[in-house]
């Protein structure tokens, strides 16, 4: 049996045609394309005189429909769109076969449980597959031939000496300056330019950039009783230790807004923040009035206000409730029909309960003089073991980000004390697994199993806990940066999740005058 994550690529594949009721099967892509091309020729050109007469009668109403099973694609533009689409079905069939082989090689994994009827729904594809390798620009309608063509560029690429380093291969894609130690790495890199996928789920049809991501797709559907790896920060569970490590990186902030103090874990989060908080651009405009907004969701909510009749009505028998917005009808379902009137939010200071998070936010700000974290527009709440949502008391900042903050001038920040390197030393708390610069795609076969409810890693990246303290009058805010390991000392051995590190940290935070964000 191959190692975990490896796909046994076979020469002979089981490629079954799904055009209409056709049951043709072959083992090579060349024969498969030759067969499907015959379907396309017959479908596009026809063979009877009656079809030709109908075509002459209604030349403007010609449609190019795909007859592949469970596919509703129809092109009104040209037959070329249909040809590219159907050829992608052929390529997709091969990827699903590789996905099936991958599952068969993993005895511990079951099948995908998502909708089988979506297995042949493929994404929108470009007008043509264009190679942008230097001095090439060949164009293809067939994705299989396109990806093989680009792969040939990587195999024919010559090694070049760059400075004092060993010879490398250069990516010749337009606008790319990447270099690689060998051709195999260049070949993998080119997939980021072509958006090539190498495996697909045989059940739901989802396509993936590598086999590891496909197997993760299956593992994420594991039943809850088999998800043995739990995040100590948000209590989510995962089937493997690596999935937990990937998830925990989302809790560590690596990026800071250049215009305010907001920090976040992902570049996409920073882009969204910049668009919503610092940009006045409102690209989504209402056709009925002068209203404009920054995202499609807000526009859809606004359009509901133009409807004379309520757009949503309750489906429950004998209930006449109606509403203009989706938010209102969902709130009605929760409160009236799902029994969601019990308070779910609890103040961690005085134990007062609330049914909505924004009511708890008002309570924390007015009753206990809590402040929003600098640069953040709201509080975050976390579900605890008793089922109540309480204020999230810990925020993780990477060491690199905190050092960047320390280098910035502290004038006008409102801090009661100045921050320097000496104030950060000597306090050992804990390490959080995960490297901020880790590649998004891992090598195949690196998925691993573990036996504990916490993640571990040979080289965990240092993390800083940011603790905001506010006095009883709410006059001053002091920020303490706590290093995860003391300078000059080896990192402490990781403790099990029940070892009390997080409990001690939160115990300190739950004092009335402490706010941990």
Swiss-Prot record:
Q: Which SUPFAM superfamilies match?
A: beta-beta-alpha zinc fingers
- Tell me the subunit arrangement: Binds MBD2 and a histone deacetylase complex. Interacts with NPAT.
Q: Where does the chain cross the membrane?
A: none
Q: In which tissues is it expressed?
A: Ubiquitous. Highly expressed in brain, heart, skeletal muscle, spleen, kidney, small intestine, placenta and liver.
* Name the UniProt record assigns to this protein: Histone H4 transcription factor
Which keywords are on file for this protein? Answer: Activator, DNA-binding, Metal-binding, Nucleus, Repeat, Repressor, Transcription, Transcription regulation, Ubl conjugation, Zinc, Zinc-finger
A Pfam family assignment: zf-C2H2_4
Q: Give the matching InterPro entries.
A: Znf_C2H2_sf (IPR036236), Znf_C2H2_type (IPR013087), ZnF_E-box_Homeobox (IPR051574)
Positions of the zinc fingers (C2H2-type)? 15-39, 129-153, 169-193, 199-221, 229-251, 255-278, 284-306, 312-337, 345-368
> What superkingdom heads the lineage?
Eukaryota
What cellular component GO annotations does this protein have?
A: Cajal body; nucleoplasm; nucleus
Chain positions covered by the region annotation Required for activation of histone H4 transcription and contributes to DNA-binding: 374-407
Q: Which PANTHER family match?
A: HISTONE H4 TRANSCRIPTION FACTOR, HISTONE H4 TRANSCRIPTION FACTOR-RELATED
Query: Taxonomic lineage per UniProt?
Result: Eukaryota, Metazoa, Chordata, Craniata, Vertebrata
């Amino acid at each position: 049996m191959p190692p975990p994550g490896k796909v046994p690529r076979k020469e002979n594949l089981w490629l079954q045609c799904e055009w209409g009721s056709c049951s043709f099967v072959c083992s090579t892509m060349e024969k498969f394309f030759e067969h499907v091309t015959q379907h396309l020729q017959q479908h596009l050109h026809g063979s009877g005189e009656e079809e030709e007469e109908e075509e002459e009668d209604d030349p403007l109403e010609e449609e190019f429909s795909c007859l592949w099973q469970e596919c509703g694609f129809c092109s009104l533009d040209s037959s070329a769109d249909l040809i590219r689409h159907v050829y992608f079905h052929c390529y997709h069939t091969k990827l699903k076969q590789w996905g099936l082989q991958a599952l068969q090689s993993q005895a511990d994994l079951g099948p995908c449980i998502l909708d089988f009827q979506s297995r042949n729904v493929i994404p929108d594809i470009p007008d043509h597959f264009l190679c942008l390798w230097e001095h090439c620009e060949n164009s293809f309608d067939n994705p299989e031939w396109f990806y093989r063509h680009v792969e040939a560029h990587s195999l024919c690429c010559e090694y070049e000496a760059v400075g004092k380093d060993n010879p490398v291969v250069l990516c010749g894609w337009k606008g790319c300056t990447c270099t690689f130690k060998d051709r195999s790495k260049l070949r993998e890199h080119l997939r980021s330019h072509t958006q090539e996928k190498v495996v697909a789920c045989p059940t739901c049809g989802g396509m993936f950039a590598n086999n590891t991501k496909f197997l993760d797709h299956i593992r994420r559907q594991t039943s809850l009783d088999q998800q043995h790896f739990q995040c100590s920060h948000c209590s989510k569970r995962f089937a493997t230790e690596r999935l937990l490590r990937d998830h925990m990186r989302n809790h560590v902030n690596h990026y800071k807004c250049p215009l305010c103090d907001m920090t976040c874990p992902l570049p996409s989060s920073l882009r969204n923040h910049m668009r919503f908080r610092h940009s006045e651009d409102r690209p989504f405009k209402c056709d009925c009035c002068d209203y404009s907004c920054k995202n499609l969701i807000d526009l859809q909510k606004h359009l509901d206000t133009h409807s004379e009749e309520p757009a949503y009505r309750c489906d429950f028998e004998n209930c006449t409730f109606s509403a203009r917005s989706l938010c209102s009808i969902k709130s009605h379902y929760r409160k009236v029909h799902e029994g969601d009137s019990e308070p779910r939010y609890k103040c961690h200071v005085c134990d007062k309960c609330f049914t909505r998070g924004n009511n708890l936010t008002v309570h924390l700000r007015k009753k206990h003089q809590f402040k929003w974290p600098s640069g953040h527009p709201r509080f975050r709440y976390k579900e605890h073991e008793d089922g109540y949502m309480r204020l999230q008391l810990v925020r993780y900042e990477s060491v690199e980000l905190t050092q960047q903050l320390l280098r910035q001038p502290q004038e006008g920040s409102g801090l009661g004390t100045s921050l320097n390197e000496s104030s950060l030393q000597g306090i050992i708390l804990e390490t959080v697994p995960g490297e901020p610069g880790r590649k998004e795609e891992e090598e195949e076969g690196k998925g691993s199993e573990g036996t504990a409810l916490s993640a571990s890693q040979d080289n965990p990246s240092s993390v800083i806990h940011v603790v905001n303290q506010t006095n009883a009058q709410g006059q001053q805010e002091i920020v303490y940066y706590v290093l995860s390991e003391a300078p000059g000392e080896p990192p402490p051995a990781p403790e099990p999740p029940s070892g009390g590190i997080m409990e001690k940290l939160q115990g300190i935070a739950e004092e009335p005058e402490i706010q941990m964000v």
